[in-house]
Design a protein with these regions (language model features):
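Glycine-rich phosphate-binding active-site loops on the catalytic face of alpha/beta enzymes
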Residues: 85-93, 133-143, 183-198
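Alpha-helix-loop-beta-strand connector modules within alpha/beta enzyme cores
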Residues: 43-65, 101-114, 148-167
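Glycine/Thr-rich beta-alpha phosphate-binding loop at enzyme active sites
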Residues: 36-44, 48, 115, 121-155, ...
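Structural motif
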Residues: 25, 56, 80, 105, ...
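Glycine-rich beta-to-alpha transition loops that act as phosphate-gripper elements at the mouths
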Residues: 6-13, 63-71, 91, 112-119, ...
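Hydrophobic faces of well-ordered beta-strands that scaffold small-molecule active sites
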Residues: 2-7, 30-32, 61-65, 83-87, ...
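N-terminal active-site wall of soluble small-molecule enzyme domains
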Residues: 31-101
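Catalytic cores of alpha/beta
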Residues: 17-22, 69-79, 116-128, 172-188
């Protein structure tokens, strides 16, 4: 199980201090949710903040775009060499083209599926994907409660996309992490405040 702490759960008044606290910890990547209220009702980080974070942290960065038209960000992101870029399947008109654009940044490419989104229609992209992320809570900002039935979706992802790395994101507690790992999730984005941001 590889953990990825989410910067969106840090205290926004103390990002610098909380990033420094992570310097000597071992985890997969620092995870940034990019939201502009066009897909979900929240706003997180702009490009200036992302660039500042990239300058300060020694850790690789993974990005989860929860917005319409994520492609607008890719040219600027290429300068900081992200490790992963995930985009929501629900936002894409031409997913294969978008995945190619992600790879041009130097990042590995992944799709994200909301809890209600079936995965079967996306199997044709299996050879173009490095990762698949399952949202394990509704990304609505209303408590981020873990949905246990998403463990079944994790199992389906492992079958449908056997060559990709399987991620889970949303409401993940220690107990939920154990369930998800048993279902086959390899990477987990954690609600980091109680775990790392102390």
């Amino acid at each position: 199980m590889i953990l990825h702490p989410s910067l969106a759960s840090a205290n926004p008044l103390h990002y610098g201090r909380e990033l420094t606290a992570l310097d000597n910890l071992d985890f997969g990547s620092l995870h940034l949710d990019i939201e502009d209220s066009s897909f979900i009702n929240n706003i997180t980080f702009g490009m200036k903040t992302v660039q500042a974070v990239a300058r300060q942290t020694p850790h690789p960065l993974s990005f989860h775009f929860m917005l319409a038209r994520p492609q607008r960000w890719f040219n600027a992101l290429a300068e900081i060499r992200p490790a992963w870029i995930f985009v929501h399947a629900e936002t894409l008109d031409y997913p294969s083209e978008t995945l190619t654009e992600i790879r041009h940044t130097g990042a590995r490419a992944g799709l994200v599926f909301n809890p209600a989104t079936p995965i079967d229609a996306w199997r044709y992209l299996a050879s173009e994907l490095d990762g698949v992320m399952v949202m394990t809570s509704e990304p609505d900002g209303q408590g981020q409660r873990f949905i246990p039935s998403m463990c079944e979706k994790i199992q389906k992802v492992r079958t449908a996309f056997p060559q990709t790395e399987c991620w889970a994101d949303g409401g993940i507690t220690l107990a939920a992490a154990q369930q998800l790992a048993a279902a086959g999730a390899q990477h987990m984005v954690i609600w980091a405040r109680p775990v790392l941001f102390i």
